[in-house]
Amino acid sequence: MFVQILIYVYLGICAGMILFNIATALLSRRREHRSFRDGIRLELTVSQELDRLAETGTVSERHLRFMERRLRRVNGMAAFDAALECLCVRRPELTRSYLTALNGVMIALAEDYCRRDEIEAAYFPYIIRKYRLLDGQENEALKTMLLDLLHESSIYCRENAMQALYTAGDPAVLVRALRIIDASSLYYHSKLLSDGLLNYTGDTWELADALWEAFDAFQPWMQVTLLNYFRFSSGAYCEKIHALLNDPAQDDEVRFACLRYLGRYPYPPAYADLLRYATPSKNARWEYAAIASSVLASYPGAETAAVLERNLYHPNWYIRFNASKSLEQLGFGYRD
C-alpha cells in the first residue's frame, strides 16, 4: 500500500510538472505574440509621425508625451527597438531626425531607468548605443546618466554605458569615464576597455591626445589598457612608447606593454634597447627577455639571430620557446 501511495505521488508530481511546462509555453507564446503585435502598432504610430515630420519638420507634443509614457515600460522600449530596426532601413534620414526630436523624452526617461534593477538599467544605454542617440549631440544629461551607471556593481550596466559613451564622439567624457573606472574597486576587464575604445566613433587623433594627456594620472593596469588600445589602433606613437619603455620609474607591466607595441610596429631607434632587454639578466624579471625575444621577430639581423640563438639554451622555457618561434619566423630552420 505504501509503495502504491509513493507511485501515485510521483505520478501527481510528474503531471504537475507537465502542466506547468505547458502553461509556461503557452504564456511565453502569448507574450511573444503580444510583443510582436505591440511592435507592429508602435511602428505604425511612429511611421505616421515620420510622415508628419516630413511635411512640417516637427514632431507633435502629443506624440512626445505618448512616447514618454510608452517607453517607461520595458516592453514598450522593446517594441520601440523592434520598430526602429525596420524604420532605420526603410527611412533612415527621417528616423535619425525623429530620434533627434525625441531627445527630451530620452532625458526624462534616463533618471527613471537608472533607478531600476540592473537588467532594466542596462537596457537603456544599449538603446542609446544601438541607435547612436549621442552621436553629434551635446547631451550632457544623458552623458551624466551614463557616467553614473559606471558606479553600478553589474558589469552589464557598466559595459553598456561605456559602449554608449564610445558613440558620443567626446574625448573628454571618455577620459572622465576611464577615471571613474580606474578609481573604482569594481573589477573591469582590461580587454573590454581596450577593445571598446576601438569602437570610438569620433576623431581618434583627438581621443589619443586626450588619453596621452591623462596617461600619467592612471594606475598601471589602466595604463596597460591604453597601451593595448594604442597597439591595435595606430603605429604613430613609437617615440612616446620607446621613452616609456626606458623609464625605470614605470611599472614592469607598463614596460611589457611597450615591448609588445614595438613588436607590432618596428621602430629602428629601439633596436639596441630590444637586444638589451632580450638578453637575460639577474637584475631584471625574466618576462623582459621572454617578451623581447618574441618582439625581435620584427627586427631581422645578425645581432638578432645571435641573441635569439643564445636564448635557445636558457633554462626558462618561455624564453626558449619565444626565441625559437622568432627564429622560425625569421626563416631559420632546425639545421641552422
Locate each region found by the language model.
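N-terminal topogenic membrane-targeting module
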Residues: 24-115
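Short inter-helical turns and helix N-cap capping residues of alpha-solenoid HEAT/ARM repeat scaffolds
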Residues: 116-117, 153-155, 185-187, 218-219, ...
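Amphipathic alpha-helical repeat scaffolds
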Residues: 51, 110-114, 125, 146-147, ...
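N-terminal signal-anchor transmembrane alpha helix of single-pass membrane proteins
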Residues: 1-38
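Alpha-solenoid HEAT/Armadillo repeat architecture
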Residues: 36, 114, 151, 166, ...
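Glycine- and small hydrophobic-enriched segments that form the cores of compact globular domains
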Residues: 128, 132, 139-217, 221
